[in-house]
């Protein structure tokens, strides 16, 4: 009987030898966000030893598995021979002189690309599943079942496996068989309805936030399932879907309707329940300011040199400011237009209220604080030469959460994985390649 992999083996071993759990010291430098190649002996990655069978494409699934990979899991990205992940061709922009899309590069670091025809290579997937801890997929419900790769099929050969399905609408219900994209779920889930100018049409958010949110939900769910597996010694099926993710992300907007019977509307950059809280036009751009408390508002108007507003009953508290929104905002907008973003930033330096210029993407990466965080990492890539990636936003005092390797080329690790993990012979691998079952 195959031994279950246990993410807490090392922890339990320590506990068995000592009542007090002591973290071993090693000479691994504190990389935090910096790219580094850790040694086997000193790898402090929380998910070291966890292997993920990644059958996802596009954004939500790859984002989920990328987060797991940053934390040290070994990610085996299963791709379609010949084309691979559709996002590889989502451009322009492409890296100069290549057909590698910058889109694909953004969510596929720390992974190994293995090309397998799922229909003809089903047995290879079974073999891999037995060596893995987690399987993540984002096919339309029923697709993998038809190939013999659904949860029940995989559970028969790998009962220890955490099987996570990411779908548009779940595996049951009126919409279950529909394909799902971020913007469609954001439309059905109300996000587009509440996004945009007050008098304008519904507006798509600038990045695929529903996809990213589902990827984060899935990553957290997988971590919890791994923790539970260490207690119950078996796997389970996790289901995440875009529509549920989007509706759960409505937070106060949903509560306003469910408990206050209040339909939401578009507010531009304003906040429905807090005033002032918006992006104010300045002499050369926009400056976003949020005064969420009365004390913050009082400091704001002092720094704006508007002492006449301090004792004005129309603005004495947030309830009054919301009621008299238009009058107050017109005053503030007129003042903000008099200076540049740089001038306002100097005036607001050290303030108790939050503020920030509306940056272009160039300005984001030129920002001195962003540079200080070392979020941007540059890695070698066999085709593009260099690739710059935004690294993990979370750091640990002990654990490593890092960029280890650049996004893989299509099928870059197929032979390596089949030989080293599955112990397939060179002859067997060559036959699979000749039959175009793998690439």
Predicted regions and their residues:
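Oxidoreductase and adenylate-handling cofactor-binding alpha/beta cores
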Residues: 215-235, 248-261, 301-308
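Glycine-rich beta-alpha junction loops
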Residues: 82, 169-170, 242-248, 284-286, ...
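Aromatic-enriched alpha-helical interface/lid elements that frame and gate functional surfaces
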Residues: 275-351, 355
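A short glycine-threonine-serine/GTX helix/turn-capping micro-motif
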Residues: 202-213, 235-237, 267-271, 275-277, ...
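Short, surface-exposed loop/helix-turn segments at secondary-structure junctions
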Residues: 88-92, 256-266, 367-382
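A glycine-rich dinucleotide-binding beta-alpha-beta segment and adjacent secondary-structure elements
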Residues: 350-401
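C-terminal active-site "lid" helix and adjoining low-complexity regulatory extension at the edge
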Residues: 387, 392-426
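N-terminal helix-loop segment corresponding to the beta1-alpha1 unit
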Residues: 3-14, 19-231, 266, 409, ...
């Amino acid at each position: 009987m195959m031994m279950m992999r246990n993410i807490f083996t090392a922890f339990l071993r320590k506990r068995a030898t000592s009542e007090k759990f002591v973290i071993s010291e090693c000479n691994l430098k504190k990389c935090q966000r910096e790219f580094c190649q850790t040694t086997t002996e000193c790898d402090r990655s929380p998910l070291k030893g966890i292997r993920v069978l990644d059958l996802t494409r596009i954004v939500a699934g790859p984002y989920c598995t990328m987060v797991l990979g940053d934390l040290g899991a070994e990610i085996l990205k299963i791709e379609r021979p010949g084309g691979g992940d559709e996002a590889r061709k989502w451009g322009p922009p492409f890296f100069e002189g290549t057909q590698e899309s910058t889109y694909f590069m953004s969510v596929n670091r720390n992974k190994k690309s293995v090309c397998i025809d799922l229909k003809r290579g089903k047995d290879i997937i079974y073999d891999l599943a037995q060596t893995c801890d987690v399987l993540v997929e984002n096919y339309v419900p029923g697709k993998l079942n038809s190939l013999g790769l659904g949860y029940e099929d995989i559970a028969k050969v790998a009962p220890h496996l955490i099987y996570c399905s990411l779908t548009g609408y779940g595996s049951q219900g009126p919409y279950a068989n529909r394909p799902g994209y971020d913007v469609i779920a954001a439309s059905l889930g109300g996000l587009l309805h509440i996004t945009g100018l007050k008098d304008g049409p519904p507006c798509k958010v600038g990045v695929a936030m529903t996809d990213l949110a589902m990827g984060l939900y899935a990553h957290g769910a997988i971590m919890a399932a791994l923790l539970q597996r260490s207690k119950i010694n078996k796997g389970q099926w996790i289901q995440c879907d875009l529509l549920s993710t989007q509706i759960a992300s409505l937070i106060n907007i949903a509560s306003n309707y469910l408990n206050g019977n209040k339909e939401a509307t578009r507010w531009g950059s304003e906040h429905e329940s807090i005033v002032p809280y918006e992006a104010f036009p300045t002499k050369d751009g926009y400056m976003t300011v949020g005064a969420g408390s009365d004390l913050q508002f009082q400091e704001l108007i002092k720094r704006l040199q508007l002492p006449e507003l301090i004792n004005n009953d129309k603005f004495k508290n947030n309830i009054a400011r919301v009621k008299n929104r238009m009058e107050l905002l017109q005053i503030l907008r007129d003042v903000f237009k008099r200076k540049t973003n740089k001038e306002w930033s100097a005036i607001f330096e050290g303030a108790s209220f939050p503020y920030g210029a509306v940056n272009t993407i160039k300005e984001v990466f030129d920002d001195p604080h962003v540079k200080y965080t070392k979020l941007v990492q540059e890695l070698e890539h066999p085709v593009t030469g260099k690739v710059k990636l935004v690294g993990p936003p979370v750091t640990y005092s002990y654990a490593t959460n890092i960029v280890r390797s650049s996004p893989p080329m299509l099928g870059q690790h197929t032979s390596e994985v089949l030989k080293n993990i599955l112990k397939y012979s060179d002859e067997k691998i060559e036959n699979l390649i000749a039959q175009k079952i793998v690439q």
